[in-house]
């Protein structure tokens, strides 16, 4: 059986008060429309078409790596009109098409699979997703036959007294036999107060043709649409609970899961402990038995097993197993830190490689450098990598001892097994086995204060 999907992503989203199309706003680090696309793909649906409108180039930019096709809805004339705009996508296809909305990011791949299975096994012409709620005010009601089949969808304003008591509501997500859908679209009109073409009318047209219409009921959170910043925040809360619950089931400890913020694509190994206030973003992988103390942010990075991070920021970098980072360290993009290293407080590292067992304990800047293993950086060391026009490279070998308050003026090389005296400004290569001293000779002028009349009596 051939299955495909159409995702409606042309809405303007006026209530978002944004210059961006609504569907590219992110929930837990991923655009809403990409949540829907990815879950459709997880349900083994390969052919996906996005109906786009205002801000189409922005939507394309955010979805071009998803291998989808696009249909253009120049004017927003209703959900039915949006599907009409995708008729070319459905042309010459036979099978089943599901229709989802790009602003409902909480739909799961399990529900999508269930929708197709229910629709195809029951040989329905149309199947919709519904939900039961305590307060259905404002929603279209699902009215069923005695057999359980869907009889009709009635908008709230059109409900009679009995229909108002129904608490099963329409989600706006459907599954259709492609041929039935295309035939029904031919009979769709905009004879209503809004002058729009409604997809709900296709259900009525299908039913009048004598075809079967079914519905599956899912939790309300799965059909939540996002039309405002408030609803975006509500969707974020639901998604965050799902993400954190998944990690806890997989063996991750959260000291306070409600104040821990993890993006949907993050991977975390078991026996890792995460303290409140941590933010883990993007395509980050954290291996087993790590400890992330409060107020740490990690983005698009790989953290090895047994790493400890405390009150620090790690961006687009790799931290080797057994290393400690922080407190208050800043690991900038393209940094690779080896195993069992120590990156201490108020240390900034940028676009550098740090070898195994190297210690950079405090108040140090390292940029555009290659640092070997078993090195020690004293407090206040600075790699001076910028000459005013471009960044220069510094190379430090193994077993180098860099004394406190040292400036390494790039480009420069410090070879293996070297010592640099505290307070030195190094501008030339330091040979292996050497002690480098580059500071002014101390001069003591005895009695100077008394001669100047500065000695306090």
UniProtKB/Swiss-Prot annotation:
Region (Linker) residue spans: 230-250
Ligase keyword on record: no
Residues engaged in binding Mg(2+): 103, 227
Span list, region N-acetyltransferase: 251-457
GO biological process: cell morphogenesis; cell wall organization; lipid A biosynthetic process; peptidoglycan biosynthetic process; regulation of cell shape; UDP-N-acetylglucosamine biosynthetic process
Cellular component GO terms, alphabetical: cytoplasm; membrane
Cofactors demanded by this protein: Mg(2+)
Chain residues that bind acetyl-CoA: 385-386, 422, 439
Principal location: cytoplasm
Spans annotated as Pyrophosphorylase: 1-229
General function of this protein: Catalyzes the last two sequential reactions in the de novo biosynthetic pathway for UDP-N-acetylglucosamine (UDP-GlcNAc). The C-terminal domain catalyzes the transfer of acetyl group from acetyl coenzyme A to glucosamine-1-phosphate (GlcN-1-P) to produce N-acetylglucosamine-1-phosphate (GlcNAc-1-P), which is converted into UDP-GlcNAc by the transfer of uridine 5-monophosphate (from uridine 5-triphosphate), a reaction catalyzed by the N-terminal domain.
Name the UniProt record assigns to this protein: Bifunctional protein GlmU
């Amino acid at each position: 059986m051939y299955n495909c999907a159409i995702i409606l992503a042309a809405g303007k989203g006026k209530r978002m008060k944004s210059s961006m199309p609504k569907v590219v706003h992110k929930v837990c680090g991923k655009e809403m429309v990409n949540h829907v696309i990815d879950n459709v793909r997880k349900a083994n649906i390969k052919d996906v078409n996005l109906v786009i409108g205002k801000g189409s180039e922005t939507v394309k930019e955010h979805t071009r790596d998803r291998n989808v096709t696009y249909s253009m809805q120049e004017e927003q004339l209703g959900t039915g009109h949006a599907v009409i705009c995708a008729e070319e996508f459905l042309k010459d296809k036979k099978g089943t098409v599901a229709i989802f909305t790009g602003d409902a990011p909480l739909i799961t791949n399990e529900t999508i699979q269930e929708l197709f299975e229910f629709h195809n096994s029951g040989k329905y012409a149309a199947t919709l997703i519904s939900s039961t709620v305590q307060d259905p005010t404002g929603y279209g009601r699902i009215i069923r036959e005695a057999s359980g089949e869907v009889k009709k969808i009635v908008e709230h304003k059109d409900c009679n007294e009995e229909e108002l008591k129904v608490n099963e509501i329409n989600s706006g997500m459907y599954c259709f036999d492609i041929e039935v859908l295309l035939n029904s679209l031919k009979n769709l009109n905009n004879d209503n107060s809004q002058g729009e073409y409604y997809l709900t009318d296709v259900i009525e047209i299908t039913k009048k043709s004598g075809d079967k219409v079914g519905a599956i009921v899912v939790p309300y959170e799965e059909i939540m649409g996002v039309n405002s910043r408030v609803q975006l925040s509500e969707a974020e809360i639901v998604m965050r609970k799902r993400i954190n619950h998944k990690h806890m089931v997989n063996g991750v400890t959260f000291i306070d899961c409600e104040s821990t913020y993890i993006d949907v694509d993050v991977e975390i190994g078991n026996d890792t402990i995460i303290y409140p206030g941590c933010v883990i973003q993007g395509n980050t992988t954290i291996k087993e038995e790590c400890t992330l103390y409060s107020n740490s942010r990690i983005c698009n990075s790989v953290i090895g097993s047994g790493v400890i991070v405390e009150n620090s920021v790690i961006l687009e970098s790799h931290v080797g197993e057994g290393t400690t980072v922080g407190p208050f360290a800043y690991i900038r993009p393209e940094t690779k830190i080896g195993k069992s290293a120590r990156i201490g407080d108020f240390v900034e590292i940028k676009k550098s490689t740090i070898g195994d067992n190297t210690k950079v304990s405090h108040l140090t800047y390292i940029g555009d450098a290659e640092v070997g293993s078993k090195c020690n950086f004293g407090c206040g060391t600075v790699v001076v990598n910028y000459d005013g026009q471009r960044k220069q490279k510094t190379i430090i070998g193994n077993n180098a001892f860099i004394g406190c308050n040292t400036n390494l003026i790039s480009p420069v090389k410090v070879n293996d097994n070297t010592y640099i005296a505290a307070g030195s400004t190094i501008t030339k290569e330091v040979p292996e086995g050497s002690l480098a001293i580059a500071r002014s000779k101390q001069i003591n002028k005895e009695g100077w204060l008394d001669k100047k009349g500065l000695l306090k009596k």
